[in-house]
Amino acid sequence: MGLLALGTPLQWFESRTYNEHIRDEGIEQLLYIFQAAGKRDNDPLFWGDELEYMVVDFDDKERNSMLDVCHDKILTELNMEDSSLCEANDVSFHPEYGRYMLEATPASPYLNYVGSYVEVNMQKRRAIAEYKLSEYARQDSKNNLHVGSRSVPLTLTVFPRMGCPDFINIKDPWNHKNAASRSLFLPDEVINRHVRFPNLTASIRTRRGEKVCMNVPMYKDIATPETDDSIYDRDWFLPEDKEAKLASKPGFIYMDSMGFGMGCSCLQVTFQAPNINKARYLYDALVNFAPIMLAFSAAAPAFKGWLADQDVRWNVISGAVDDRTPKERGVAPLLPKYNKNGFGGIAKDVQDKVLEIPKSRYSSVDLFLGGSKFFNRTYNDTNVPINEKVLGRLLENDKAPLDYDLAKHFAHLYIRDPVSTFEELLNQDNKTSSNHFENIQSTNWQTLRFKPPTQQATPDKKDSPGWRVEFRPFEVQLLDFENAAYSVLIYLIVDSILTFSDNINAYIHMSKVWENMKIAHHRDAILFEKFHWKKSFRNDTDVETEDYSISEIFHNPENGIFPQFVTPILCQKGFVTKDWKELKHSSKHERLYYYLKLISDRASGELPTTAKFFRNFVLQHPDYKHDSKISKSINYDLLSTCDRLTHLDDSKGELTSFLGAEIAEYVKKNKPSIESKC
């Protein structure tokens, strides 16, 4: 997420009057983009990753670890007085939803294969954040603030005690009301101070007509309560405070705020394709990799102080920004007295146009983009409503008519309302601005994002980014080594897809992808579940699939990721002759071998996922009471372990347990040179 402009945010009941204006103007901006950049070609494979961190405050005296919401000035300083430090180290920091969060990227994109530099750059980002936080600790000590505590940036997918007592480092956060979210569990201090974020939170709640609602299955142990006993009665907000007992379900962890989802962290990787056609092909080819990589990277086994009976974050974020009204969800409102006919905050004059929408605006991919010789329209076999007005405009116009399949993609995105509108940005020059288009585009959060360039990205302007695809499902991992390994893996897959594009047909039915996303949430899916995976990726095959385990999906000689995508591109680059394991004996690419070994060993179940490691830690902790609850002491010890792992500290044998003896020994002895860019 880039730096945020200041402005005057419009509250939902005012902003909704401009919804159609923003949609209309956004589509005109998109047409100007296609007119300007549609013929762009021969762009190089630039790419880059985005890592999200949680700043965790460790109170060693009280044995409590909390989210740090007191030092969010770090973002301003890193982009102002410390900008030269970031520039010199080729890193860039950006805001995220949580006040305790940092997003960091390379300042300039990578070009093709860059070896260990991905990891080096990640190390630099973490080192700079740690340096700033240590500065604050010294200042706080002088001012007698936060005495005895230390704040560190951890790449955690989820904070295990989010929404529990004493989970943020401010005293008495409940001595005032939390008007933006109205959550029973999250004070508004968890939200980024920038006006966009509390306004977005309130707009989603108001449009929906109810608070958001996420029910995640509890992990069942011998003393697990029948219901979520953290729910309590409150009379601050009517009707919201009446919803919890109606919305929660026995045997489930109940969450009621955007922060539970958008406060999670992830790893995202974006790739520039040579042209729009290759970008569409790449997007479609990666669609079914998304649920596989979600399950493979599982790192979220706990929410709101409970162990969950699932391992990933995705459905929690999906629910956290689900602004669909009861009418759009096809359900009755929780409190009909306050949500007449289930239309929520939708204006009366457009209620007759309301569609039933099967999924949240944060979901898996809904449509293949097509345009490839391998594509058949029947592959899009799911219920995907579209904005017919938008579809018509994209198909028939005098600027840049789109083909049906690409037009349908954008027409589907445009069934959504804008949920973040600034007064100063209502009127724009559609020939030069893409803000209205991005207002809708960037608030459709799917497992992949097809990213058009701007109107300035004409074929001769190679300094402007071209047609890109963002891969979004990865859960963030604890170690820079792990995150670099996962980033390099998806780079190799992308490079393989683009290099051998005439020979790789990755299409399956979209309904199978949706089923895979559900399976990916299951506890230990990497070990015990099977997923729909294509029997063959040859160019003469159809969409036939069979059910395979994650290990088979990675290793099967006929259709596995290693033999069909990774090894061929390594051979093409001259890194190996027959098999990726040859890298172990390469003086130049040994680290790549250990990246791929980590991935292979995780996929085969020889090494635990982060989710499995976390769950086992809790279950084996001496303070655990077999009630599925994560106490302060358990959380403190768990996150202290995460801190040690992050810094490759194997003094307690944790790194060896987590990575296996061979990889742990390698990473301890072989830290990449921060000067190396090969």
Swiss-Prot record:
Catalytic activity from the UniProt record: L-cysteine + L-glutamate + ATP = gamma-L-glutamyl-L-cysteine + ADP + phosphate + H(+)
Domain of life: Eukaryota
An individual GO BP term: glutathione biosynthetic process
Pathway annotation: Sulfur metabolism; glutathione biosynthesis; glutathione from L-cysteine and L-glutamate: step 1/2
Any matching Pfam family: GCS
Enzyme class: ligase
UniProt EC number: 6.3.2.2
Activity regulation info: Feedback inhibition by glutathione.
Keyword Ligase included in the entry's annotation: yes
Record's miscellaneous remark: Present with 5130 molecules/cell in log phase SD medium.
Family listed: Belongs to the glutamate--cysteine ligase type 3 family.
Protein name, entry field: Glutamate--cysteine ligase
Species the sequence originates in: Saccharomyces cerevisiae (strain ATCC 204508 / S288c) (Baker's yeast)
Organism classification: Eukaryota, Fungi, Dikarya, Ascomycota, Saccharomycotina
